[in-house]
Amino acid sequence: STDGIILIAKNVGVNLTSVNMGVPKFEWHDIPISKKINTLKLPIEGHPTGTSIGNPHCTFFVEDFENIDLNKIGPEIENHPLFPERTNVQFAKILDPNRIRVRVWERGTGVTLASGSSSCAVAVAAIRNEFTQNKVTVDLDGGSVEVNWQSDGVWLTGPTAHSFSGTLTKDFLKYE
């Protein structure tokens, strides 16, 4: 969820789309976090970085990437008192200044293979911490995407595929 924000997308190749995910926010009240603190190094073991990409994210940068028990740690961080609306949780390993490996715990869902907003949040957190360049490849369990933080927002570029077809009725399209 991106809080009902309209996202701009464009085709940039065959089965490749870029989406402007918006301008990231870092102020404690925008994420939101329960108290006024520096969001670059949150006061949680591991000192994760807090970011909002229209939804809250908490990114840990770790070396021992594969041995993280997401099913145990994910819900603990998601429901931490610091996050009044709960949070998405990412564990990231910097592979080089242009590439990051990520595992995701999505709030309300659990372990997920991929997440666009999590990919953007991790990239932005890595850039804020001066670990990477503004344009990085994010490798997730479900595939890889490119994230490019520009002045007009964070651009997410990745593969697209047809997943379903259907017809929407006029009643479905009416807004209340």
Task: List the predicted regions and their residue ranges.
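Active-site proximal loop and beta-alpha junction motif in alpha/beta enzyme cores
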Residues: 1-112, 124-176
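Short amphipathic alpha-helical face segments that pack within enzyme cores
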Residues: 117, 121-125
